[in-house]
Design a protein with these regions (language model features):
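Noncatalytic, solvent-exposed loop/strand surfaces
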Residues: 21-451
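N-terminal secretory signal peptides that target proteins for export/translocation
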Residues: 1-5
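Bacterial N-terminal signal peptides
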Residues: 6-21
């Protein structure tokens, strides 16, 4: 495998007539949904209103196709993409396919690429080609070969491509190490999407597939495999989560067969059954509880669980029950299919793919309000919600971001349109919102107030 650093021409548009504002120390967004599960630090310059030109600091065209989310470290915005030699693959479209999607293996040569974009200017510093080949695996029309979000520790960036491998690069674009992964079969040929997670010098990777699923840990500095455990699971698309609770640190993995917790050396701690047949949302923690959702739209069982720390063995619910010693509460039908829910303040907010929004008490599961339609004309939602400045934001597949009021009353406060499809969850860095659409990366921020 050869590695090449390629410099290309890019389109960068600076939208402030006064020029790009000087950067101060950035608050990093190092992984999918940031450090705090979608909750960003407040900043008066974080935007609540925008369109394709309003409050846009810059836009940068990103070649190829990728639905991985952007991540931010200092002045570096990292995204991944896969660039095809010819534009012959079926185009994704917003909304639900209901079995009408095309699943194909491309016959064109592809390049798997990591991009480093300057947060201050929007210019691409470098792009690193990690692989050039014909794709060996099919994918769903709506998926991409670059749907796994990278992760960074502020020194290195780690990129995972399903069926290709795991790569570590420094901030100059040099490949420090790589681990090739064998081709595996994903359910219905839909491709992969589970992102890696980084914790105290270790990278954790889950690869649930229809051949042999596994979870593994790698040394972040050297790439050495520390351990690998096979899993009795079929294909899932949920990323792992390291839960640091008041008793221990544990690696949480969800699956359509079981939710499993491992210690950080790969020993199984506890597990439970009772998920939908496809699992996508990422686990996260708040208020001392672990939140797990699994909501495949075709299933009757679409559960959300709140788990207490300290469990061991099988903690599956008995038939007809919703709680036990370690399940603080559960609900059988409130989970989303793609988006990961959000806990802000006392409430668990759930964005459903078909454009409904719900709120429940995060500690008890009590319904605050049931399904509320966000907009009658929205095509669907895949991106996960985020919050700052006491406003919740949800991004539709059409590229429309709806601004919602948090609290006990549902209210839509505004709508911001970029006019292009997106599935990626945005990043937030200090005073800026970073949104990835099908072809572009946007930095959006309120102008600095005149002194």
């Amino acid at each position: 495998m050869s590695f090449r650093l390629c410099l290309i021409g890019v389109v960068v548009t600076v939208a402030y007539s006064v020029g790009v504002p000087a950067l101060t120390v950035a608050i990093d967004w190092p992984q999918f949904r940031g450090r705090d599960a979608g909750v960003a630090a407040n900043n008066p310059r974080l935007p609540s209103a925008w369109d394709s030109t309003r409050n846009v600091v810059w836009t940068t065209e990103i070649p190829g196709v990728g639905w991985s989310s952007p991540i931010v470290s200092g002045d570096h915005v990292f995204v991944t993409s896969v660039v095809a030699a010819s534009d012959t693959d079926p185009k994704p479209k917003p909304g639900f396919y209901n079995g009408g999607a095309v699943t194909t293996t491309s016959t064109a040569e592809h390049r798997w690429v990591v991009y480093d974009v300057a947060l201050a200017t929007g210019k691409i510093r470098w792009q690193r080609e990690l692989r050039r080949a014909l794709p060996q695996l099919p994918k769903h029309q709506k998926n991409s070969y670059a749907s796994e979000t990278p992760v960074t520790d502020g020194t290195r960036v780690y990129a995972l491509f399903g069926g290709v491998g795991l790569f570590a690069l420094n901030f100059e674009g040099q490949v420090l190490w790589s681990k090739e992964f064998a081709d595996v079969k994903f359910r219905n040929g839909w491709g992969g999407a589970a992102s890696p997670v980084l914790h105290r010098g270790r990278l954790y990777v889950v690869c649930d597939n229809d051949d042999q699923s596994f979870v593994a840990a790698f040394d972040a500095e050297t790439g050495r495999e520390l351990w690998k455990v096979n899993r009795k699971e079929g294909t899932n698309w949920s990323s792992p989560f390291v839960w640091e609770n008041d008793q221990r640190s544990e690696l949480i993995t969800t699956g359509s067969d079981k939710v499993r917790s491992y210690d950080l050396n790969g020993t199984l701690l506890w597990e439970f059954a009772g998920m939908s047949t496809i699992t996508i949302p990422t686990p996260f923690a708040r208020h001392g509880l672990l939140f797990i959702s699994s909501g495949y739209v075709a299933d009757q069982l679409r559960p959300t669980y709140a788990i207490k720390p300290g469990a061991s063995g099988d903690i599956s619910l008995a038939p007809g029950t919703t709680t036990n010693a370690y399940v603080a509460w559960s609900h059988p039908t409130i989970a989303p299919y793609n988006p990961t829910p959000l806990v802000y303040g006392d409430y668990l907010y759930t964005l459903l793919d078909r454009g409904f929004f719900t709120a429940h008490d995060a500690r008890t599961g009590r319904e605050i309000y049931g399904r509320q339609r966000i907009a009658p004309d929205a095509s669907g939602f895949t991106s996960s919600p985020w919050v700052y400045n006491d406003k919740i934001f949800v991004l539709s597949e059409d590229g429309d971001t709806y601004v919602l009021q948090p609290g006990s009353e549902f209210k839509v406060l505004g709508k911001n349109s970029l006019g292009e499809m997106t599935l990626a969850t945005p990043a937030v860095s200090e005073d800026s919102l970073i949104i990835r659409t099908a072809s572009k990366l946007y930095r959006i921020s309120e102008p600095e107030s005149p002194r």
